[in-house]
């Protein structure tokens, strides 16, 4: 058996001379089959699941195939892994794999997003920290003007404060109208005084 035939028997849907795909039962395939003999029986590499039962009619089979890409994409987005920015190593989400530990920067960004979306009920522009520790929540090396790296929890809180300040500046003050927020199946209503 020539090397051309042995290559073709290893991968029957690839032309051994050009390394291009060929159609099963196409002219090139039939010529190679006549020259080298039939390829060994293997299951198709694309078919990983068992065949469907032949009882279904083709119109019913074709319609779910057309709609399956549309149905599968929302499922993936619902199963998106959440970031965890806390300090509990025994968090249920971390243990069962539904959450992953975020980096300092990811937790900062998550906090900014939460701060921008939460209502501002009280804001104090006159602020001076009791402990003046400058934390760094980036991905790179610690800059000279920062004291230390922040923990995930600290970066989440810092991001929340940054988001609230951005919202305060953007919206021009505290929340004026009522807000209704759903949280864990309950509705919270924030009413102005």
UniProtKB/Swiss-Prot annotation:
InterPro entries recorded: 2-cysteine_adaptor (IPR014901)
Biased composition (Basic residues): 43-78
Annotated region (Disordered), positions in chain: 1-84
Listed Pfam families: 2C_adapt
Family listed: Belongs to the IIV-6 378R family.
Identification of the protein by name: Uncharacterized protein 378R
Source organism: Invertebrate iridescent virus 6 (IIV-6)
């Amino acid at each position: 058996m020539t090397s051309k035939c042995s290559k073709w028997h290893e991968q029957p849907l690839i032309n051994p001379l050009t390394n291009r795909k060929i159609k099963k039962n196409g002219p090139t395939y039939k010529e190679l089959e006549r020259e080298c003999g039939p390829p060994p029986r293997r299951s198709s590499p694309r078919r990983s699941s068992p065949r469907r039962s032949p009882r279904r009619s083709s119109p019913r089979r074709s319609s779910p195939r057309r709609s399956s890409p549309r149905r599968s994409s929302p499922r993936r987005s619902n199963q998106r892994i959440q970031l965890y920015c806390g300090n509990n190593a025994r968090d249920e989400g971390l243990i069962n794999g539904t959450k992953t530990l975020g980096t300092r920067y990811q937790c900062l960004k998550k906090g900014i997003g939460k701060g921008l979306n939460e209502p501002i009920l009280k804001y104090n522009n006159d602020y001076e920290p009791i402990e003046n520790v400058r934390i760094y929540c980036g991905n790179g090396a610690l800059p000279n003007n920062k004291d230390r790296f922040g923990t995930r929890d600290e970066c989440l809180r810092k991001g929340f404060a940054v988001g609230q300040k951005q919202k305060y500046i953007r919206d021009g003050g505290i929340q004026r109208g009522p807000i209704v927020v759903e949280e864990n199946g309950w509705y919270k209503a924030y009413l102005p005084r």
